[in-house]
From Swiss-Prot:
This is Cyclotide cter-E. Coiled coil: none annotated. One of its GO terms (biological process) is defense response. Belongs to the cyclotide family. Bracelet subfamily. The presence of a 'disulfide through disulfide knot' structurally defines this protein as a knottin. SUPFAM superfamilies: Cyclotides (SSF57038). Contains 3 disulfide bonds. This is a cyclic peptide. Probably participates in a plant defense mechanism. It comes from Clitoria ternatea.
Length: 31
């Protein structure tokens, strides 16, 4: 539920994905 300051509209979460973030509603979120 916490925004990870990365978008995933065109490409998946990259840097923030390593921190555990996942794509939700076109934005990378962490819980």
């Amino acid at each position: 539920g916490i925004p990870c300051a990365e978008s995933c509209v065109w490409i998946p979460c990259t840097v923030t994905a390593l921190l555990g973030c996942s794509c939700k509603d076109k934005v990378c979120y962490l819980d």
